Structures are given as C-alpha cells and as structure tokens.
Amino acid sequence: MVLDISEIRTAWQDSDFITDCLCWHNVYRQRHAAPPLTMSSELCHLAQTWANHLAHTNRFYYRNDRDIGQNLFCRPSNGLVQEVTGQEVATYWYSAVRQYDYGKEPDCLHANVNAGHFTQIVWVSTRYCGVGKARSRSGKVVVVAHYMPPGNISGSYMENVLPPCEEYPRVAPPPRLILPASSVTTGSSRTTSPST
C-alpha cells in the first residue's frame, strides 16, 4: 500500500514526538524565566499541514504568514531510516542561544539569521505551540513548529528574550505529557520577521 504523504494526519494527543518536543521547549523556556507553552490542536494542524507540504514538494521554506511564529528543521536522508526525537529538534533550535547577545536590542535582520530559532522558543509573550513532522519519499524528515503569539518582533527582544536564570532545574522532563487541546485564534496585528 502506498500512502500519499499529503494525506497523513497526526493527532497530537497521541504523538510522543510532539509531546516530547513541547516538553523540551518548556525546559528551555524555564531556563529563561518564560512561562510554559500550551499545545494548541489548531497550531498542530497548521504545522502538520505545512510539514506535509514541504515533504511532498521536497522544498524547505517558511510559510508566508506573519501572524504565527515559525521554526523549521530538516534532516536529509542518509540511506538509513533515522527517526528524530522532539528533544533533538528542540535542542537544535535552542542551540542558537550561542549567537544571541543579551546586552542590546538586536537588528531584526541579523538576529533572526543568527538566533531566531532560539529567540522564538524562549519568547516570553508566546503562549501556544503546535508541531508537525513529515517524511518525504526520499526519507528526508521535516519538522515544523508554529507559535502564537509570534516572537521575533522588532523592538521587543529585550523584554521577551531573557538571559538564563542563575539556577534552574537540571532534570530531564517526563517522557510524555498528556495535555488538553486548546483553541487559539490566528489573528494578530503585530508585524514579525520569519525566524530561521
């Protein structure tokens, strides 16, 4: 049986990958005194639809939608079937922390190129997250995360991207979270730059 990748749907409530990714987002947010994110079924659906599109078309680019924050991850196929974990993806995005300068309001164009994945993860005013994952016919894995309200807003970095706390728990998150679905409207009048 051949399954058309554009028809794959993920129920986030049953996805260990999605709950693991959310959990690690919240571990990193806690390090920066940001409140925990809540998973949104609407954002999961949008992220899964976009991940399916990218995998099906074998392309890799951000949605043209300034009303949501976005992070993308891609692992090309190396001939072996390799699964990615939510921890691996969130850690990859967070690793851009090394590029961020807490001492000044960054130039949005340069900040997003260097640290946009990180800043979106820890953006204090972001409250909701949705994640989708798809595999292309060639085996490439694409992961998409969408955030509401979006981060990486020019002029708002200083109050939304806080330095790491002196002390934070260094315990691994639980392997699986069961979270209630949430509904988030996607209307926003703030202008953002796509994060990379």
Indicate residue ranges for each PLM-predicted region.
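Disulfide-stabilized extracellular recognition modules
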Residues: 82-190, 194-196
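Disordered inhibitory propeptide/activation segment of secreted metzincin zinc metalloprotease zymogens
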Residues: 1-3
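Short, well-ordered surface patches within globular domains
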Residues: 6-69
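Generic short alpha-helical segment signal, independent of protein family or function
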Residues: 52-55, 77, 94, 98
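General secretory precursor processing signal
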Residues: 24-26, 77, 111, 168
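A solvent-exposed, acidic/Ser-Thr-rich amphipathic alpha-helical stretch
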Residues: 61-90
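Generic structural "secondary-structure junction" signal
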Residues: 39, 62, 70, 74, ...
